[in-house]
Amino acid sequence: MKFDYDIVWTAHEIRIFDALRNLASSYGAERIVLFGSRARRTHGEKSDIDLAVFGCARFRDFSFAVDEEIDTLLSFDLVDMDGIVSPALAAEVERDGVILYEAVR
């Protein structure tokens, strides 16, 4: 996995990720990882934002808040990594993932 400061983001992505970090903190998430085409930087203009969410007891509330409170026309695809996740998906997140948020413990 990489950290978000390893990549040059657009101003729009920065605004989205800042809002996401605030929500992650508010909902008690331990870690948020971007994966998929945006993490690989192979995305198109309208590609969705794939997020792996770790350690969020209020995942459904968090997922709803992300959709409702983050101002973008892009769609989000959130995966609760504490639930049942295929080995292929877990490997993709580990291989391509970019850590956007990690709680301070």
Regions found by a protein language model. Name each.
Residues M1-R31, A39-E45, F54-R105:
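Catalytic core of pol beta-like nucleotidyltransferases
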